[in-house]
């Protein structure tokens, strides 16, 4: 297969940041996707529908002319989120979900939920109104090994949560382990998962063998190859519980190449080509459209896109860097390497 035409894909998990960063991040994402779930972990975080709509306007100001990119907004779940805010999400045309970060789990997550039992009143409303709860699925206890944090979250947080709220709509975001994949498979249709390009294409050897490579460092961290293999199997299976979410996360070069470097891979500029490469490597390119263009929209109860994109099989050199912020650079995932697919 030398070319493939898909319904325009969507990104169900992306970080755009705010302010000057939007000049870089919004056009990069808008050239790839029709819609994106825009993460709320700004400083300060996006905690109300009003704040989300204001952030959406800031994003729209940077969409290239002639592009119909539609940012879909998310609220940041805190210990102080009001149950009434859930009703406002349900009534909003542009806000689709609420994101729960365990406090301290990732970039700008210090305002996150300290104990999920404290917010059961809000979760009750999420279940009633069928508003999706998006989860960064890791525990954050210092004594838990970083490679075990996802599995511990499933056992200690998510399993009890779904027993208490069996109809809750949940997206377990950026899954990285066989444990998470099998957990999602065992649940009803109200539980789904997103998978990033880096967790399909790479594993912890890519990050750690032959020197530490900071551009593979993200959270949840890359796992061993056996987990990567399982993620590829479920992503390419045609099961609608698994769909595209890049978790594209911009950090300037000096924040990544650092004694204490930031977590996140910037995949937005070549995201769909990265996924195409992953699917093609296992001979499942025909399954890409469902994963990228159908299943996420279906889960969120939104119409599928009607426009299409075409990918052709030809060498596609990923740029070494892009301009970012004031006189800084951002290094994309797979910088300086050649992909086998190009979006035309």
UniProtKB/Swiss-Prot annotation:
Keywords: Hydrolase, Metal-binding, Pyrimidine biosynthesis, Zinc
Annotated pathway: Pyrimidine metabolism; UMP biosynthesis via de novo pathway; (S)-dihydroorotate from bicarbonate: step 3/3
The protein's required cofactors: Zn(2+)
Signal peptide feature range: none
Official protein name in the record: Dihydroorotase
Active-site residues annotated for this sequence: 247
Family membership noted in the UniProt record: Belongs to the metallo-dependent hydrolases superfamily. DHOase family. Class II DHOase subfamily.
């Amino acid at each position: 297969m030398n070319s493939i035409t898909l319904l325009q894909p969507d990104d169900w998990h992306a970080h755009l940041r705010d302010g000057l960063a939007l000049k870089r991040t919004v056009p990069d994402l808008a050239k790839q996707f029709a819609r994106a779930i825009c993460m709320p972990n700004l400083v300060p975080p996006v905690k109300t529908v009003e704040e989300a709509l204001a952030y959406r306007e800031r994003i729209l100001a940077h969409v290239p002319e002639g592009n119909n990119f539609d940012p879909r907004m998310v609220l940041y779940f805190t210990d102080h989120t009001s149950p009434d805010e859930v009703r406002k999400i349900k009534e909003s045309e542009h806000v689709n979900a609420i994101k729960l970060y365990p406090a301290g789990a990732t970039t700008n997550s210090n305002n996150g939920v300290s104990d999920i039992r404290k917010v059961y009143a809000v979760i009750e409303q999420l279940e009633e109104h069928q508003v999706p709860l998006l989860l960064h699925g890791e525990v954050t206890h210092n004594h838990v090994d970083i490679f075990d944090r996802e599995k511990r979250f499933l056992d200690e947080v998510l399993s009890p949560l779904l027993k208490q709220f069996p109809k809750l709509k949940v997206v377990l975001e950026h899954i990285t382990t066989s444990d998470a994949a099998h957990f999602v498979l065992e649940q009803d249709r109200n539980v789904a998962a997103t998978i990033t390009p880096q967790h399909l294409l790479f594993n912890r050897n890519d990050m750690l063998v032959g020197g530490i490579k900071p551009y593979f460092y993200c959270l949840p961290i890359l796992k061993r190859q056996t987990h990567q293999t399982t993620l590829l199997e479920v992503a390419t299976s045609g099961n609608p519980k698994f769909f595209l979410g890049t978790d594209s996360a911009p950090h300037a070069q000096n924040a990544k190449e650092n004694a204490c470097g930031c977590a996140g891979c910037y995949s937005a500029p070549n995201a769909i080509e990265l996924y195409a490469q992953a699917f093609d490597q296992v001979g499942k390119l025909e399954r890409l459209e469902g994963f990228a263009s159908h299943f996420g929209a279906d889960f969120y109860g939104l119409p599928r896109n009607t426009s299409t994109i075409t990918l052709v099989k030809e060498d596609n050199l990923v740029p070494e860097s892009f301009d970012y912020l004031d006189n800084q650079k951002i290094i994309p995932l797979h910088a300086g390497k050649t992909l086998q697919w190009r979006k035309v």
